[in-house]
Amino acid sequence: MSQITMRQMIEAGVHFGHQTRFWNPKMAQYIFGARNKIHIVNLEKTLPMFQDAQEAVRRLVANKGTVLFVGTKRQARDIIREEATRAGMPFVDHRWLGGMLTNYKTVKQSIKRLEEKTAALENAAESGFSKKEILEMQRDVEKLERSLGGIKNMKGLPDAIFVIDTGYQKGTLVEAEKLGIPVIAVVDTNNSPDGVKYVIPGNDDSAKAIRLYCRGIADAVLEGKNQALQETVAAAQEAAAE
């Protein structure tokens, strides 16, 4: 698992919070001080908390768990998609659809529609559809793919959710709380840590910082998968030896 260092966090600007006038008092315990009217996050707290989050992810995935990566704001979208894909985990990078978890039954129907439309599009030319009809089908598929593409292979509700910017993803937190799904989240000085099981206090606007968090969590996922694989192989060898 990648060992993130204090130096890497400083270089990525993890310690830069929001303007002091926008602060959330619930984040006071994680704030070191202020510089030029900007809150400075205490990285001596952030680093071990991030490591705790990584360890929780590793354990969960080693037990065949699923982590849903969520980051729909502009700076986070591409990074969330890339790192979740690298880790082989589901993600939401475009827009959080209300009921994505609490109304998962309906979402599953939409995913089925996406699969059917994708299959129909692949055979559209041979099936005699006009160019105009094919173009309309493409637009439909692209629209559904944007909203649901990252979760189309998710087998059921996730076991945990990793979130960038709790203020931006309020809907995600509300649904996770309703369903009792633990949340691992980057929480900046202007947001509340309420409803987050594993808080990572830090900058949620810098692309460099977001890349650092996502890479660290994705690495933890891959380590958990590797552990699960090793345990499966060891069990198979043991069974064969008996």
UniProtKB/Swiss-Prot annotation:
One of its GO terms (biological process) is translation. One of its GO terms (cellular component) is cytosolic small ribosomal subunit. One of its GO terms (molecular function) is structural constituent of ribosome. InterPro entries: Ribosomal_uS2, Ribosomal_uS2_bac/mit/plastid, Ribosomal_uS2_CS, Ribosomal_uS2_flav_dom_sf. Keywords: Ribonucleoprotein, Ribosomal protein. CDD domains: RPS2. PANTHER family: 30S RIBOSOMAL PROTEIN S2 PROKARYOTIC AND ORGANELLAR, SMALL RIBOSOMAL SUBUNIT PROTEIN US2M. Belongs to the universal ribosomal protein uS2 family. This is Small ribosomal subunit protein uS2. The lineage of its organism: Bacteria, Pseudomonadati, Pseudomonadota, Betaproteobacteria, Neisseriales.
